[in-house]
Amino acid sequence: MNAGTAPPTSTAADRPLRADARRNRERVLAAADEAFALEGPGVPLDEIARRAGVGAGTVHRHFPTKEALLQAVLVGRLEGMLAEARAALAAADPVESFFGFFRIMTDYAQNKMDLAEALGRQGVDVRAVTHDVATALRRALDELLTRAQDAGAVRADITVDDLHALVVGTVAAVRASAPQDAVRVGALLSDALRPGKG
């Protein structure tokens, strides 16, 4: 290195968070996730800070805008769903693991879609924001589906794209139904995936 050349410096974004800062960020994300799930994405940042037990400045340091927090919660939910998919892949029974994960995916979608729709209304490219985790999730879902089809438990003509379309349709149907009908709607959908039901 030349004497007149300064060593490269890392930016704040490059440096790992201190343990206390990381804990605060996790508390904010947990509070936001719960608040958005219960009350929708309109909960203000100051209220998120109160529920997380941190100052408003702490929230703004980690998430300068409401949009940034919504994006982080959305990605976090997809990462949670990916972890569930990987756990299902590790299970011995390909049929139960597929249908169990499909129920989880439908439940997740009811909350995830609210955030995705809110971000879309703000002009955010949701597909770009979630690309990496969504790609990994699609691969895991494809493997779960293939295993269930090989076991003869799911129609051979069903694709991952079909599953996504069915989940979106199911969420819409559940939203339009009485709360007590949600389980029945989900059961009807699972039944439609089985051979001989199409």
Task: Enumerate the predicted regions with their spans.
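Helix-turn-helix/winged-helix DNA-binding modules
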Residues: 40-41, 61, 155
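Short linear capping/connector segments at secondary-structure termini
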Residues: 117-126
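Hydrophobic alpha-helical connector segments
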Residues: 72, 83-111, 125-129
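Short hydrophobic/aromatic patch on the recognition helix
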Residues: 53-63
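C-terminal peripheral helix-coil segments that are non-catalytic and often amphipathic
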Residues: 1-12, 107, 139, 143-154, ...
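Conserved terminal C-lobe alpha helix of the protein kinase catalytic domain
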Residues: 71, 75, 79, 86, ...
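Basic, helix-initiating cap at the start of DNA-binding domains
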Residues: 1-51, 68-71
